[in-house]
Amino acid sequence: MRPGIRTATLLLFALVTISTAHAQAHTTDSRPLQLSVFGGPTGVFTGLAGGRNLSFTAGVDLGFGTYRGLLPMAEIRGTEPFDDGNVDAQKNALGGLRVVKRLRSIHPYGDVLYGRGEIEYQGVGYLNPAGNIYYQKTNSNIFSFGGGIDLDISPALSIKFDGQVQSYKVPVTVSGELYAKPITLGVVYSFGFGQRHAF
């Protein structure tokens, strides 16, 4: 894992841990169940030989309460390409932790996700560094770190700007890894279990 990603991940988990510990020792805001779904087109820079995909990402977020103005949520999401590009096509399913800070109608967040992914190499396949095997498909565990902003346009709807860095283990690079960078522009629908609040 790259040092920058490792540091940011540790900071995110530390933030959640500190907030939770504080909440256990003090009276905190209590909020109703938070459930939202999101989806939208995703441009993926695959990290392999300039490869690009045009994909669709969809997911669900579930939170149970806020701590000192932070909303920890469980998230699951999946990405499926509909334009595979000329190098490789990446799809994955991920789950993990998302932490949101609600600032009136603007909601920045960070997330740490883990899951499985599949890469299909276009044409006859992709040659390994040793030059003796063409790979047509590989599967890998994925670590994903990223964040974004949700902008409210109504009580139930928001526009999502999301970016991730995703680490795949692959046999077709010298390092044995590649780092994909998906960027999503999507729509969020929040279910009405209670009104949103600004902190």
What does each model-found stretch correspond to?
Residues 1-9:
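Bacterial N-terminal signal peptides that target proteins for export
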Residues 8-18:
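Bacterial N-terminal signal peptides
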Residues 22-65, 78-81, 182-199:
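Short glycine/proline- and aromatic-enriched beta-strand/turn motifs that initiate or cap beta-hairpins
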Residues 46-50, 81-87, 119-123, 170-174, ...:
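Outer-membrane beta-barrel proteins
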Residues 56-129, 140, 184-191:
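Gram-negative (and chloroplast) outer-membrane scaffold detector with strong preference
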Residues 69-71, 107, 148, 152, ...:
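Membrane-spanning beta-strand positions in outer-membrane beta-barrel proteins
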Residues 153-199:
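Predominantly the C-terminal beta-signal and adjacent terminal strand-loop region
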